[in-house]
Amino acid sequence: DTIENVKDDDSVNTILRSRKNSSIYKGLEYTKNNLDTGFVSAGNTAALMVLSRLHMGMISEIDRPAICSLIPNKKNYSLMLDLGANLTVNGNNLLQFAIMGYCYFSILNKKTKPKIGILNIGTENNKGLEFLQEGADLISKSFLNEYFTGFIEPNNVTSGECDIIISDGYTGNIMLKSAEGISNF
């Protein structure tokens, strides 16, 4: 039984100290102890990220969790991450998101050579913020190089040219909410 609710404006400290009897806290605790289960929540995103990390831990060499979703495209779907967990990132975080995306996409889809792109304002190698350039460089120097197509512009996210689209959480969340708004137009 749960007797507490995580509110949308609860701080991380409040969530950790005062919401131990909430459905998010209890559900993730249950999921940790029952590995054949999953957990879905429409609740407070910050609570979900913090409590997931607390209860589930992180994969070795991965610093931060990322929110991902399947985005429909002209061919099938693309996996996009991060969609809001990390407002600020560095190039190494983008590499880690690419690794997580590659692993997850490979489980969902038996495609052996998924195409990976970084969401950016242009496809040219010299465009975009420093962390995007750094992320592209790190991905190009990793085992993912053979799958990396470079940068993808927002207007091509639904084209199907990339199977995995990497972004910082701020930009990814704006992209997601813009698409949701347009689909309701």
Language-model features: where?
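Phosphate/nucleotide-donor binding subsite
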Residues: 1-36
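Short, active-site-adjacent cap segments at secondary-structure transitions
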Residues: 5-7, 46-49, 124-127, 156-159, ...
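Short glycine/serine/threonine-rich phosphate/pyrophosphate-binding segments
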Residues: 21-28, 32, 38-52, 63-68, ...
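Structural motif
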Residues: 22, 37-39, 46-47, 77-80, ...
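Alpha-helical scaffold segments in soluble metabolic enzymes
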Residues: 26-30, 51, 93-107, 134, ...
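Glycine-rich phosphate/nucleotide-binding loop
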Residues: 53-66, 73-78, 159-185
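A structural-propensity feature for long, helix-poor, extended segments
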Residues: 72-92
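Glycine-rich phosphate/diphosphate-binding loop of Rossmann-like nucleotide-binding domains
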Residues: 87-154, 163, 168
